[in-house]
Amino acid sequence: MASTLAMTPVATERTITRKSRTPEPSPGFAGPGHTAVEVLAARARQTDPFVLLMDDRLDFDPGQVLGGEHPHAGLETVTLMLEGGLDGEAEGLLQTGDLEWMTAGKGVIHGENVRAMGRTRLLQLWIALPRALRHMEPQVELIHLASVPVRREPGAEVRVYSGRSGDLI
């Protein structure tokens, strides 16, 4: 997805202003069976363009419908499936290692009929779009694990979902 947006890299120098420990999981918005950890809290001045990073843990019966319709606008959500999966009629099937990159742009309503595939864990990062791109048409890209390039080095394996690592783009 990042390759479809014409964005100029911007170097921003930052200093560490505070350190914190990641909190314990707390009840999530989807009710019993959902816990979440706010890994990166919304502190726009310190974390811009990153709005929020959540570590969501879902323990629902397979096929159970989750959440419901909800809107996003002016941002991108990047969802990495760490364990399990979700099956969304509109979004498609996300399984372990898959990534969904949704650019909400001028606005999108999504999340209807998303079904759990049993125990699931995912990371979701919210990124503020630059002002010039906040009113673009919404788009969604699913990146399935099998299509993600892998860079192997002694003692390390890097999957490149966006950007580059060494010679991999």
List each model region and its residues.
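A short beta-strand-loop-beta hairpin characteristic of the jelly-roll/cupin
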Residues: 76-96, 105, 109
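Hydrophobic alpha-helical membrane-insertion signals
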Residues: 2-37
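A short glycine-rich, His/Asp/Glu-containing loop-to-beta-strand
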Residues: 26-79, 146-169
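Short, conserved beta-strand element in jelly-roll/cupin
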Residues: 70-86, 126-131
